[in-house]
Amino acid sequence: MKNKKTALGSVRKKRRKLQCIETFFQTNDLVTAKQMLSSIMQYAVNGKDWLKKDPSVILQFHQSLNLFIREGYMISKKKKKRKVNAASYIGSPMMKGSLSAKEYENPLLVFKRAFKEYSIQEFDYFISGIVYFSQQMYRYGPESNLVRPYIHLSKMLDAAYLMLERGIQKNDSKKVK
């Protein structure tokens, strides 16, 4: 008899740490991603005008943000197994971006806090909503609160970029009782 394992299951390779986030920042640098998110958010809340960018660019950004959110969720679940390398000297407060001092020291906290407050589905709903409302003029705007998910997503972008810069390692230290 033939082996009935699927090709995906039998050939599955170990994924590198932060591979989706690396890919996200290869296609969108941090500044561009935050500007795109900010402009989509502004047009979604405004309602009197729509974002006049190529819809394919916005759709690609929407899809890459969805993958980014899923990778962030996986990071938040593996928090105890990973540790971000120590921060170097902070030259100016602008280097921290939207992160607090504690979040700058440990960017994994950003993901833990974001997914403690919102689920993946709620982030998907938020991203889909702002993209939808930024693409058209409307009379009645979005129903839900858009500010909190936007702040979390902006912080996650900053934290993920820091994690890529510093590197991440497994936390092998065990607590002694």
Cite the ranges covered by each PLM segment:
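Sequence/structural signature of long amphipathic alpha-helices
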Residues: 1-177
